[in-house]
């Protein structure tokens, strides 16, 4: 059995990466969303082990100390991170994993696991990104301005990713990710065991 593909998805706020990932998971089998660990309090409807692994600050810092995380970050006084063991076990079982994280975390994952596939979700235009952020009606103009400044930085960092997928239409963006993962599975570097089995060399 070939190992699964670790697909790391990032993109600026408002680009629709969460919607694209959700559509992908609903559409394609044998693909799972990596469950992150966090020290923040559970919100109504969230379940431990499904939405997040809810940890105390001490438990999370112990995970950092034991090198149990692929990546982690601190945001609004809470830790967020990706448990290494769960991801590795799923990949070894041949499952494909979608990891939706910000750019610094994605580049850290690539350092540790060079075989990971980094996909950056791009807006059709910067104007469209601004329109989507304003259309959410969830943030003040000041917050939107900060998010747009951050978005410009992230769009530049996307040059370090493996692929760019423009989210003009959610279903189409989801299909493009599927094509990328499918093509990655055909790479010679991922099929050396098959070559040896067939050729005996």
Where are these regions (language model features)?
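ATP-dependent small-molecule kinase phosphotransfer cores
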Residues: 38-97, 104-107
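ATP-binding Walker
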Residues: 15
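P-loop (Walker A) phosphate-binding loop of NTP-binding proteins
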Residues: 10-12
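Short hydrophobic/aromatic beta-strand immediately N-terminal to the Walker A/P-loop
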Residues: 6-8
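Post-Walker A helix-loop "phosphate-sensing" segment adjacent to the P-loop in P-loop NTPases
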Residues: 25-34
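Conserved phosphate-donor/acceptor-positioning beta-strand/loop module used by diverse small-molecule
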Residues: 97-102, 111-135, 166-167
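NTP-dependent small-molecule kinase module
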Residues: 138-139, 153-201
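Walker A/P-loop
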Residues: 18
